[in-house]
């Protein structure tokens, strides 16, 4: 599990260089991070180390991450955001 200080750092890392990513990633972190398994939390943190153009392409469905754990996390993020608009 992550400490409050670590979560604060993760939240800061959710702030991206692209507003489009901020709008997708930050709500997922705030609403879902604590309910993820430890392995999923690790995948989320690892995903934040990705370059913005790659992350944007994956979230928009214009490509697929080769790492299966990260790809599954992208799918969770996308599904969470789609559930909010339906």
Swiss-Prot record:
- Any GO BP: succinate metabolic process
Keywords for this entry? Chaperone, Cytoplasm
* Any single Gene Ontology cellular-component annotation: cytoplasm
Q: Give one Pfam family, short name only.
A: Sdh5
InterPro entries found in the cross-reference section: SDH, SDH_sf, SdhE_FAD_assembly_factor
Q: Where in the cell is it found?
A: Cytoplasm
Q: Which domain of life is it from?
A: Bacteria
Instruction: Say what the protein does.
Output: An FAD assembly protein, which accelerates covalent attachment of the cofactor into other proteins. Plays an essential role in the assembly of succinate dehydrogenase (SDH, respiratory complex II), an enzyme complex that is a component of both the tricarboxylic acid cycle and the electron transport chain, and which couples the oxidation of succinate to fumarate with the reduction of ubiquinone (coenzyme Q) to ubiquinol. Required for flavinylation (covalent attachment of FAD) of the flavoprotein subunit SdhA of SDH and other flavinylated proteins as well.
**Name of the featured protein:** FAD assembly factor SdhE
Organism phylogeny: Bacteria, Pseudomonadati, Pseudomonadota, Gammaproteobacteria, Vibrionales
Q: Which gene encodes it?
A: sdhE
């Amino acid at each position: 599990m992550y400490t409050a200080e670590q979560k604060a750092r993760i939240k800061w890392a959710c702030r991206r260089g692209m507003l489009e990513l901020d709008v997708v990633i930050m709500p997922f972190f705030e609403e879902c991070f604590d309910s993820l398994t430890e392995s999923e939390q690790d995948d989320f943190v690892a995903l934040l180390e990705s370059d913005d153009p790659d992350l944007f392409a994956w979230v928009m469905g214009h490509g697929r991450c080769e790492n299966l754990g990260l790809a599954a996390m992208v799918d969770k993020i996308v599904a969470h955001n789609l559930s909010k608009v339906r």
